[in-house]
Design a protein with these regions (language model features):
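Positively charged, helix-rich recognition surfaces that bind polyanionic ligands
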Residues: 1-158
């Protein structure tokens, strides 16, 4: 499938999901220059660097605007390193509260395990809410018992 066509389908699926679930704000993490000095090996570099992430963001912004959904672009630096569950300040530190214990699995300072991508996503959402001056204790909402199953096993949409 052609990349542009795939990006249209992915962005449409995200917007449809948001509309179906009455979600009105999309937080998108972005790091300027994040693919510039990547070194994953020749083949992986070619596959990874060719992903048109900026194109996806532009499509999301356009489709979300048509649907009345607010898009907030957030600098995602250190969102994967800092522990959302420990309410760690998202910035560079000498020592971090949590850590990755293996690929895809993050453990907080208090011993709670969470999917590493979920940890990063929650930190991006937290930064986005701060950017919008929203005072909301997202942690309390996320840790409600009915939401805990998503912390280790995220739902795949596409």
């Amino acid at each position: 499938m052609h990349k542009v066509n795939y990006m249209h389908k992915v962005s449409r699926k995200i917007v449809e999901y948001m509309e179906a679930n009455s979600l009105n704000t999309l937080f998108v993490g972005k790091n300027v220059g994040w693919k510039d000095s990547i070194n994953l090996g020749r083949t992986n570099n070619q596959n990874f660097v060719s992903i048109p992430y900026n194109m996806l963001i532009q499509m999301l912004e356009y489709k979300c605007k048509l649907a009345g959904i607010n898009v907030v672009i957030v600098n995602e630096a250190y969102t994967s390193k800092c522990s959302f569950l420990d309410r760690e300040k998202i910035s560079k530190h000498d020592n971090y509260a949590g850590r990755r214990i293996k690929r895809g699995l993050f453990i907080s300072n208090s011993g709670i395990m969470i999917n590493a991508d979920i940890n990063g996503s929650l930190n991006i959402m937290h930064l986005g809410l701060e950017k919008q001056n929203v005072k909301l204790d997202v942690l309390e909402e996320i840790l409600r018992p009915e939401n805990k199953r998503f912390m280790l096993n995220p739902v795949r949409l596409c």
